[in-house]
Regions:
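Hydrophobic ligand-binding cavity/cleft-lining segments
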Residues: 1-38
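Intrinsic-disorder/low-complexity, polar/charged segments enriched in Ser/Thr/Lys/Arg/Asp/Glu/Gln
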Residues: 2-8, 15, 39, 51, ...
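A generic beta-sheet turn/junction motif
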Residues: 11, 75, 103-105
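Hydrophobic pocket/interface hotspot
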Residues: 18, 28, 52, 71, ...
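Beta-strand/loop substructures that line and gate deep hydrophobic ligand-binding cavities in soluble
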Residues: 81-131
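Short, highly charged C-terminal tails/helix-capping segments
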Residues: 140-147
Length: 147
């Protein structure tokens, strides 16, 4: 049975910055690929009904996998919902991802739900990948660059 992954983080950044990091192609390749992977955005049309395609490449092995989907809901600085599907036929099914951004006293509370993760991907591996990605997201949006 497909897995559902739920993650929660509080980031020291505004909802505007965190939301933008999920929709900006340059930001996505900086933070979304987990440790050991590089990323490439092939296209990103971030509007409801628009689509995206991205790939991760294992840096040491050179193997890559592509995935993409469609934006279902975009509420600026509050919520993103999209579908996500791997191109590899061995990773079947469409996933549904919901990200909720909530302004809190010290930044942004981010909740992520990823439903329908294919059975062949261990849930713990998915959690690990997301955790690594969220550390990179924090480094991007929490940076205090004065120039």
């Amino acid at each position: 049975m497909p897995s559902t992954i739920r993650l929660h983080r509080v980031l020291r950044a505004t909802p505007e910055w965190v939301y933008r990091a999920f929709l900006d192609p340059d930001a996505m390749v900086k933070w979304l690929p987990p440790n050991g992977f590089t990323g490439k955005v092939h296209h990103m049309d971030a509007h409801v009904g628009g689509s995206y395609k991205m790939s991760f490449k294992n840096f040491t092995m050179g193997k890559s996998h592509a995935f993409g989907g469609e934006y279902v809901e975009l509420v600026p600085h509050e919520r993103i919902r999209y579908t996500d599907k791997f191109e590899d036929p061995n990773l079947p099914g469409a996933m549904k991802v919901t990200i909720i951004f909530k302004k809190v006293s010290c930044g942004t509370d981010v909740s992520i739900t990823q439903e329908g993760v294919p059975d062949v991907i261990p849930a713990e591996a998915c959690y690990l990948g997301w955790q690594e990605s969220l550390i990179l997201l924090a480094k991007l949006v929490e940076a205090e660059i004065l120039v």
